[in-house]
Amino acid sequence: MTATQKHNLFTPEPHYIPGYAGFYPQLRYQVGNTYGRTTAQLLTDPSVQKSPCSVLSPMTKPKFIEDFSKSKPPWIPCRDLREPYIPHYTSLKPYKNFEILGQLPRQDVDTQGPPQVENRQGPLTAGFMPYPPYPACPPGRKGEARDLGHPGLLLAYGEEAWKDAAPLQDTPGKNNQLYHCRRDEYLPPHPPQETLDVGRFQRLPQLDHPNLIQRKAISGYAGFVPRFAWVMGMNYRDGVTQAMDDFDKNQFVFRHPVCALGERLPRTHWPNTTIYRSQGLIPFYMGFIPSMQDNYALTFGNSTRRAYQKELDRRSHTL
């Protein structure tokens, strides 16, 4: 079956909807057609250059290029989402899991011998001490740390903790010496952690044109701003704010003219007098009508006529 053809009275596609206040090229030189037909001719004319980011909806049906036939790997949440700290925070985390910074892991101490001092700094000068002159810890057992709770309590209690501890039981093949952590001993660098991948939060479907969905909306306000002029070097937001402030000041002076005492107010004191008519206003007028809210049991036309009479009485008693 052939598709139904639209009548020539209808506006051809594509065209801009009336009321669009954006920019379109060469419209000022087209005469004799309606707004829709003129924009349709411009959009279909190959000689007119067009922006790749059009505000019109796509003419053709978008194609989904995402392949759903292949099985996807299980989604693994990013580590930054499981941590309570700020994402990408790599500084110090005090008392994290009650670990002492600079202490070798437990499995490394069990399997290896005394940690070799690895100096990663440059050559030391004469008289330089790589670590504070703390006395070396006396020998003890590994189980003493569990007896006293936190491993750092051994150093806090001092000699009494070592004297009260049970005697050593040497085990062949293992070295139970506790070593003091020096500042010139460094742990191996941690493997790089997984960073936050912003792309995994993208929920938009993959189309043949990336910005196809965003093209349906007109970005930015392109309407009329009173007393607004393009000034070189001024931001749009600042220009609109300055224009609206200037407009408010102008309206205040226009509605409150300066006149001497005893003089009659000029006609500009009532700039919106066109809404007051003896015939009354037509229905569905959505503007503001002063003193109309005090009228009851009247139609819209009679209420506006009553407001017109009240306005005449008010002006007659005004200088």
UniProtKB/Swiss-Prot annotation:
Keywords: Cell projection, Cilium, Cytoplasm, Cytoskeleton, Flagellum
GO biological process: flagellated sperm motility
UniProt record similarity statement: Belongs to the CIMIP2 family.
Keyword Disulfide bond in annotation: no
Domain of life: Eukaryota
CC annotations in GO: axonemal A tubule inner sheath; ciliary basal body; sperm flagellum
Annotated source species: Mus musculus
Predominant location category: cytoplasm
Protein name: Ciliary microtubule inner protein 2A
Keyword Cytoplasm assigned: yes
Subunit structure, as described in the record: Microtubule inner protein component of sperm flagellar doublet microtubules.
Known function: Microtubule inner protein (MIP) part of the dynein-decorated doublet microtubules (DMTs) in flagellum axoneme. Binds to the intra-tubulin interfaces.
Gene: Cimip2a
Compartmental location: Cytoplasm, Cytoskeleton, Flagellum axoneme
